Amino acid sequence: MDEEYLALLERAYKLVAPKAQRRAEIPKIEVQNMPRKTIIPNFGQIAKRLNRDVYFMAKFFQKELAVPGTIEGDVFTLHGEKSPKVVEAVYERFIRYYVVCPVCNSIDTELKREGRIYVMKCLACGASTPVRPL
């Protein structure tokens, strides 16, 4: 009976999908300080890899840092001097609130608007989680 049980258990483990791994690592943010400006040259590339709208990300950064900004191509310019550590902390907060699935910790998520609420749908585990409004 033990051998039969172990054989069935082995078969069940083979049928179950392996634990979801992160498809990609979180991209690093590049921050360049200029006089009275802070430039993020890889902002568009980051938004594309995280599967987020560039304007949604920019709005979050502008509200968190309390400075206006402009997007030109892949470059996001904040019209105020902010230290790279502060910008990186805001970026990590964005990742935590709007990218990482709270159920399985995967970054394979998409953000959809349902009425007045933003909902994060995980592509790895299928969980739907409402997120904080901007």
Swiss-Prot record:
InterPro entries documented for this protein: IF2/IF5, TIF2_bsu_arc, Transl_init_fac_IF2/IF5_dom, Transl_init_fac_IF2/IF5_N, Transl_init_fac_IF2/IF5_Zn-bd
Source organism, top-level taxon: Archaea
Keyword Protein biosynthesis: yes
Pfam families in UniProt: eIF-5_eIF-2B
UniProt keyword terms in alphabetical order: Initiation factor, Protein biosynthesis
Role, per record: eIF-2 functions in the early steps of protein synthesis by forming a ternary complex with GTP and initiator tRNA.
Subunit structure: Heterotrimer composed of an alpha, a beta and a gamma chain.
Name under which the protein is recorded: Translation initiation factor 2 subunit beta
Organism of origin: Pyrobaculum islandicum (strain DSM 4184 / JCM 9189 / GEO3)
